[in-house]
């Protein structure tokens, strides 16, 4: 018996491995895997149902059909183990060998492997340097190919048609060798000398100058070198032996009624075997060439279909007209091996049911129906029953449980105690979609869920279902309790704010409780404390809202950090005093002494967590919930039709709007305004009217008149139920109330355009038929959008996870001094995001100096906490350089300091944290909240866009950066620089507002001057771009020839005449070469020089420029010489929402991107062509100038002779991230992508920490292009992993050799995922065939570094608790020990894991 157990144990041992290599299989290798040749297409005998000998299910080749029993039944039982039966030839062993033993088919004629032939670029074609078309013609027997030319004039690899071949035969006889079919290609491949070929190609590469040729050569060299290094032989891409899959992986299942269901592979194999056998027979018979050829072609097609059906020609279909599933289809796609069985599996010990509310549960509990618990915990119950001696055998225990005896329930109670279960709600968009709870047994059949975790699950109780999973092993239970317990997940990993926040009823209850009311019962009482407040409220002596004085004792930390009690009498209300009783000691009373809305409650929980830690916060959250529910019930807030008060002014506002619309209609009919203007104006009028109605309604709703104690009427905030719900943040918003009691307003058509007749009614009044019909548009579009959005958002998340999955924190500090500058996000006059929110939880990259001094406020490498951020705010620091993952120098993974704080835990991140996946989830999860729309800017919006002045909002000092200006005669500044920025600094030196000042603006006040709020500081004309002179003097026209380069126009209304420069297209012959310009000369007629240069002041005029000056007039510096009208680009579509985020992460180039200056220098224009202008930038140091052709229709923002910096905008448009990376560097592109993505999310009110976006950007910047190879193996122009190049360079530097240089590339997330080092990860993402083909040819090794690869091979992932295991393996490998397969007892494992978890200081998980 003992050796039987030993034998069974030995069977389960897995082999330890460090990496997985994929390569081409040689024929000998295939034969070595095989256990015999499959010679017949038969499967099983239809009478006996036994497998046919030598057939596809042959027992002699693949193993016995029944355990330890040969086919003919001579040997049965275990004692004959390993005997081979002499009658039927079957080895006596377990049946499961039929899952692993392979067979093979000896092909009568070689066939090409379709993957290496047809998967683009064709590997065979690239290797032979022949077009795919030609190779196919050879393979499918249409033409001959010359294998050896011999002494003839035929080239090797030359293609010959039938006639040419016959001619050549006549001419040369057997001096040359030409064949057709796969034999020919095989011979060509076999005869290749790879090393020799490599040499010649490298020589060619050094000599050639053509870019396309270089690219082609580089590709071939890479492929050839891959073959040389991997030890693959090219001729192995042609199959001579075909492996046969083990039969249990392509089963034949008998159905009832004598029919069989079979895997498609069997059909495909049968075709191959039939054709192969027929071909063998024909060859033996020496059949005519044409018949053999046809058979060979058919064999080639059969093998193609088996390997990848439908890749070439029409897919082979089965009896039901469906294409057969080939081997390639088995592994690719959502239903393929990778995504269906390896990355996600169905699990046992799980159940699902509908969820209902459990308002009495504690945060760490969930209600589990008894029926479910009994089923899920069965094995544990059986074990306990046997242990107690209540059942003798498992069978008896089973019976007891089935009968549901009383004792079983007691045992279930014991088993369940302290055994957490996991609850999951699909779709699991982020890690908080699976959390652990302690089950509480309940009657009924629905799972009860704690209301506070609904936000994390995005669950509601309208019929949602959830799944329960039971962690079985001790380790799993420990992880569930320490890491996944709902009490340990209070903060959201996306933004570090509490996610366990009360919503809806609870918020309403707390809001109602903390409101105050004038002249309520019991006003003016003085109470001894919260207890008394509760007593008099219960006794009915005072109202909840009564304003009273209460004696309050607070615990406050003094300057030394000790807790001291402080007692004072506070003006407050009864309700707030009662609420104070549940607030944990250590928080100030001021936190509840205000009407509590949703934001205030969230802030209160956040403060509690930061000051007191995890445990008090969890208890507090529960208490808040119970109290909130109780007082929401007492408040009796309800919705009645009388709560929707329609403002009295509504009718007159609408009437006014209608008269305005009628006026515009009249103007339109008399031709004063165009149709477009009329439409825009009408929409503006109605939008304004809607706003006015809404304002009147809210003023009406939000206050009510009351009589106070002295009998005086005063106003107080309203107790209207609907208003309270919206004001507290419990449900609804001003926009929704507007539709109930104001007017519904303008509606959009499905294409996004606005219908100009608004719905003037609201829901309180009711809609008429037309209004109802107009409303249906929007409602339907909403539903259709939601469906699309969910799919798109899920796909975005999948791509993000895939690109970032292998990014893990691997060391504490990489020691870099680089980082990115963080400044507050300021748009116009508002601070969109203050500095503290952007730097909180980051590590400083440099010392932060106190402004105006040399004192160090915060040293470098300090994690910025709330306290430090307060310090920064007090000292009004307005920019901080922080460490970032983008500039982290760790080779594989990132370091903890560059990442900073773990947002979900509030301390610096632990090693082994999978930050890539967290980032992907944080960005993808809110994706469903983003819109799918592209916004048409029309009407109100576009008019706001054409601003013409800057009006500051606050008092402060002006600060101008990158500015050039001249003073005009009036003593005002005229701006002559392009990207001038204006900041408003307050008295503490903080930036309050930030504006772009366009070229040609006139400013009344300059740099460093004081301004008051509301003052206008700059003006400009938004419709034209001026040409400003920087010097004074007299105008001299140059090349301004009437009728050739200019034309004179006279305005009919004013009688003024002006000159308009003609576009080069409009000029006649001689005018084409003239370049109209305005020169400035002094009184003597000599050129005036531009100050600071030796260039004469002359201003070249582009086409369409308007000049309103005459020759010889005197002008002053800062005057406008000419105006260039700006074409208003109609209604522009702004891509918003989800598609915009996807475009940014895919790094797509915009349609007409901004043109940036490639180098710094002076602008000039060279010779023009028909449709393009030649822009020349000459560097100031006199090195080579840069030229670029720019289409004429692009508007340029630069004039001749202007100096630009590298990366400046030359022509406006959306910027391309690739250009930003090339010209302004990694940090600029990071900033660009981060800001643009944040913009989209900010519009929806979603907060995501910048870190997450930076993590994705780091992954997009993984690759670089080699500029010069130095002493490395790399080829110039090849794309390589940046970390690999850096490692190679470090080695070279140590040896004192030349290092390689490279430029960073920005890849979109899909491309970056496919370009990852790990072929397993890439293959399981997209384009499986292409990835595997490429990897096999190159003989790639997958080092199993990422998470995905390890999940696929069935290991612990190298992150989280699996990180230690992987570190241990690496250490052992480095020391040359053999890694032991851990045989750990459960107790040891628990101890180790506990130690590991404590080391990661994960906060206290003591849920009592």
UniProtKB/Swiss-Prot annotation:
The gene is rpoC. Mg(2+) binds at residues 460, 462, 464. Gene3D superfamilies: 1.10.132.30, 1.10.150.390, 1.10.1790.20, 1.10.40.90, 2.40.40.20, 2.40.50.100, RNA polymerase II, clamp domain (4.10.860.120), RNA polymerase Rpb1, domain 3 (1.10.274.100). Keywords: DNA-directed RNA polymerase, Magnesium, Metal-binding, Nucleotidyltransferase, Transcription, Transferase, Zinc. Transmembrane segments: none annotated. The keyword Phosphoprotein does not apply. It comes from the Bacteria. NCBIfam families: rpoC_TIGR. One of its GO terms (molecular function) is magnesium ion binding. Pfam families: RNA_pol_Rpb1_1 (PF04997), RNA_pol_Rpb1_2 (PF00623), RNA_pol_Rpb1_3 (PF04983), RNA_pol_Rpb1_4 (PF05000), RNA_pol_Rpb1_5 (PF04998). Zn(2+) 1 binds at residues 70, 72, 85, 88. Its EC number is 2.7.7.6. DNA-dependent RNA polymerase catalyzes the transcription of DNA into RNA using the four ribonucleoside triphosphates as substrates. This is DNA-directed RNA polymerase subunit beta'. Zn(2+) 2 binds at residues 814, 888, 895, 898. One of its GO terms (cellular component) is DNA-directed RNA polymerase complex. It comes from Serratia proteamaculans (strain 568).
């Amino acid at each position: 018996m003992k050796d039987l157990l030993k034998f069974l144990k030995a069977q389960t041992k897995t082999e330890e491995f460090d990496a997985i290599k994929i390569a081409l299989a040689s024929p000998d290798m295939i034969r070595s895997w095989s256990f015999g040749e499959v010679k017949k297409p038969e499967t099983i005998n239809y009478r006996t149902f036994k497998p046919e000998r030598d057939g596809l299910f042959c027992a002699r080749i693949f193993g016995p059909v029944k355990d330890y029993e040969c086919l003919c039944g001579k040997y049965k039982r275990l004692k004959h183990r390993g005997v081979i039966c002499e009658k039927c030839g079957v080895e006596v062993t377990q049946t499961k060998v039929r899952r692993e033993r392979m067979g093979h088919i000896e092909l009568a004629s070689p066939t090409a492997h379709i993957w290496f032939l047809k998967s683009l670029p064709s590997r065979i074609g690239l290797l032979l340097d022949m077009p795919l078309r030609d190779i196919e013609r050879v393979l499918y027997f249409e033409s001959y190919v010359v294998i050896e030319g011999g002494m003839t004039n035929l080239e090797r690899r030359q293609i010959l048609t039938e006639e040419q071949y016959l001619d050549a035969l006549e001419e040369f006889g057997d001096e040359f060798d030409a064949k057709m079919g796969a034999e020919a290609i095989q011979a060509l491949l076999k005869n290749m000398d790879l090393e020799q070929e490599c040499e010649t190609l490298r020589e060619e590469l050094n000599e050639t100058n053509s870019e396309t040729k270089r690219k082609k050569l580089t590709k071939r060299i890479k492929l050839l070198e891959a073959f040389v290094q991997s030890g693959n032989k090219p001729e192995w891409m042609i199959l001579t032996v075909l492996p046969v899959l083990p039969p249990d992986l392509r089963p034949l299942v008998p159905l009832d009624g004598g029919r069989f269901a079979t895997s498609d592979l069997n059909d495909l194999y049968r075709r191959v075997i039939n054709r192969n056998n027929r071909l063998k027979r024909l060859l033996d018979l020496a059949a005519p060439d044409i018949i053999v050829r046809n058979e060979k072609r058919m064999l080639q097609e059969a093998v193609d279909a088996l390997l990848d059906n439908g890749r070439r020609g029409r897919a082979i279909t089965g009896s039901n007209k469906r294409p057969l599933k080939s081997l390639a289809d088995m592994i690719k796609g959502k239903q393929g091996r990778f995504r269906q069985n390896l990355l996600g599996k169905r699990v046992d010990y799980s159940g699902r049911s509908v969820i209902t509310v459990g308002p009495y549960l504690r945060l760490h509990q969930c209600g589990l129906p008894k029926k479910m618990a009994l089923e899920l915990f069965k094995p544990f119950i059986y074990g306990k029953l046997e242990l107690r001696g209540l059942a003798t055998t498992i069978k008896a225990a089973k019976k007891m449980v089935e009968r549901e005896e009383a004792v079983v329930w007691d045992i279930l109670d014991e088993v369940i105690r302290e055994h957490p279960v996991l609850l999951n709600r699909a779709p699991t968009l982020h890690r908080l979609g699976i959390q652990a709870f302690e089950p509480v047994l309940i009657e009924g059949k629905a799972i009860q869920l704690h209301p506070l975790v609904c936000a994390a699950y995005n669950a509601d109780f309208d019929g949602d279902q959830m799944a329960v999973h039971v962690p079985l092993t001790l380790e799993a239970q420990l992880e569930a309790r320490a890491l996944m317990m709902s009490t340990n997940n209070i903060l959201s990993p996306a933004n570090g704010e509490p996610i366990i926040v009360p919503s809806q009823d609870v918020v309403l209850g707390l809001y109602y409780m903390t409101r105050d009311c004038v002249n309520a019962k019991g006003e003016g009482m003085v109470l001894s404390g919260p207890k008394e407040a509760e007593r008099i409220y219960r006794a009915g002596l005072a109202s909840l809202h009564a304003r009273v004085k209460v004696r309050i004792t607070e615990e406050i930390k003094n300057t030394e950090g000790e807790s001291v009690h402080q007692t004072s009498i506070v003006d407050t209300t009864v309700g707030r005093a009662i609420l104070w009783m549940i607030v944990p000691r250590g928080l100030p009373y001021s936190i509840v002494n205000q009407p509590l809305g949703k934001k205030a409650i969230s802030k209160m929980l956040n403060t509690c967590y930061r000051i007191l830690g995890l445990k008090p916060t969890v208890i507090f959250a529960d208490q808040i919930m119970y109290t909130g529910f109780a007082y929401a019930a007492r408040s009796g807030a309800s919705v009645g039709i009388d709560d929707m008060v329609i403002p009295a002014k509504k009718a007159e506002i609408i009437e006014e709007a209608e008269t305005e619309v009628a006026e515009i209609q009249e103007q339109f009919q008399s031709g004063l305004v165009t149709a477009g203007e009329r439409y825009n104006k009408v929409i503006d009028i109605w939008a304004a009217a809607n706003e006015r109605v809404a304002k009147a309604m809210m003023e009406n709703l939000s206050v009510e008149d009351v009589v106070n104690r002295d009998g005086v009427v005063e106003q107080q905030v309203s107790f209207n139920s609907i208003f309270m719900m919206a004001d507290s943040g419990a449900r609804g918003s001003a926009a929704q109330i507007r539709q109930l009691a104001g007017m519904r307003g303008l509606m959009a058509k499905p294409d996004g355009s606005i219908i100009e007749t608004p719905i003037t009614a609201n829901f309180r009044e009711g809609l008429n038929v037309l209004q109802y019909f107009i409303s249906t548009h929007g409602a339907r579009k909403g539903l259709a959008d939601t469906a699309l959005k969910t799919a798109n958002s899920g796909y975005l998340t999948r791509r993000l996870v895939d690109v970032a999955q292998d990014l893990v924190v691997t060391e504490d500090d990489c020691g870099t001094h680089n980082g990115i500058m963080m400044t507050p996000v300021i748009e116009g006059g508002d601070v969109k995001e203050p500095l503290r929110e952007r730097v909180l939880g980051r590590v400083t990259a440099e010392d932060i100096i106190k402004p105006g001094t040399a004192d160090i406020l915060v040293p470098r490498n300090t994690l910025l906490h709330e306290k430090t951020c307060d310090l920064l705010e007090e000292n009004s620091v307005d920019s901080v350089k922080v460490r970032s993952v983008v500039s982290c120098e760790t080779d594989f993974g990132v370091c903890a300091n560059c990442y900073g704080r773990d947002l979900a835990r509030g301390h610096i991140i632990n090693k082994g944290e999978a930050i890539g996946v967290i980032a992907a989830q944080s960005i993808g999860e809110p994706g469903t909240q983003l819109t799918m729309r592209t916004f048409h800017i029309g009407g109100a919006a576009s008019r706001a866009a054409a601003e013409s002045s800057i009006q500051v909002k606050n008092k402060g000092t002006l600060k101008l950066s990158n500015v050039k200006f001249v003073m005009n005669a009036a003593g005002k500044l005229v701006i002559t620089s392009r990207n001038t920025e204006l900041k408003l600094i307050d008295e503490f030196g903080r930036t309050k507002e930030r504006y772009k000042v366009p070229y040609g603006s006139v400013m009344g006040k300059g740099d460093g001057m004081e301004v008051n709020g509301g003052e206008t500081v700059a003006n400009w004309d938004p419709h034209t771009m001026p040409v400003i002179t920087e010097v004074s003097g007299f105008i001299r026209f140059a090349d301004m020839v009437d009728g050739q380069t200019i034309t004179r126009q006279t305005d009919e209304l004013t009688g003024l005449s002006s000159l308009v420069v003609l576009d080069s297209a409009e000029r006649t012959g001689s005018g084409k070469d003239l370049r109209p310009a305005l020169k400035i000369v002094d009184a003597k007629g000599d050129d005036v020089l531009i100050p600071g240069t030796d260039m004469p002041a002359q201003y070249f005029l582009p086409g369409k420029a308007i000049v309103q000056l005459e020759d010889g007039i005197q002008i002053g510096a800062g005057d406008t010489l000419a105006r260039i009208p700006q074409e208003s680009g109609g209604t522009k579509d702004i891509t918003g929402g989800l598609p915009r985020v996807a475009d940014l992460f895919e790094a797509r180039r915009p349609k007409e991107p901004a043109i940036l200056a490639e180098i710094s220098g002076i602008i000039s224009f060279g010779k023009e062509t028909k449709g393009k202008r030649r822009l020349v930038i000459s560097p100031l140091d006199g090195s080579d100038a840069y030229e670029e052709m720019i289409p004429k229709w692009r508007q340029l923002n630069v004039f001749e002779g202007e100096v630009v910096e590298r990366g400046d905008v030359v022509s406006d448009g959306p910027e391309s991230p690739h250009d930003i990376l090339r010209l302004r560097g990694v940090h600029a592109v990071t900033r660009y992508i981060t800001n643009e993505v944040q913009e989209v999310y900010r519009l929806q009110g979603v907060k995501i920490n910048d870190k997450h976006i930076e993590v994705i950007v780091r992954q997009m910047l993984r690759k670089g292009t080699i500029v010069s190879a130095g002493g490395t193996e790399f080829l110039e122009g090849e794309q390589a992993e940046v970390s690999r190049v850096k490692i190679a360079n470090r080695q070279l530097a140590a040896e004192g050799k030349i290092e390689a240089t490279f430029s960073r590339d920005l890849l979109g997330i899909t491309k970056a995922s496919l370009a990852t080092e790990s072929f397993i990860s890439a293959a399981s993402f997209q384009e499986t065939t292409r990835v595997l083909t490429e990897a096999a040819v190159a003989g790639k090794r997958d080092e199993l570094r990422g998470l995905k690869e390890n999940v696929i091979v069935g290991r612990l992932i190298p992150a989280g608790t699996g990180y230690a295991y992987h570190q241990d393996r690496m250490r052992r490998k480095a020391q040359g020990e053999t890694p032991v397969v851990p045989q750990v007892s459960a107790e040891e494992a628990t101890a180790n894991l506990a130690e590991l978890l404590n080391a990661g200081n994960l906060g206290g998980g003591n849920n009592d």
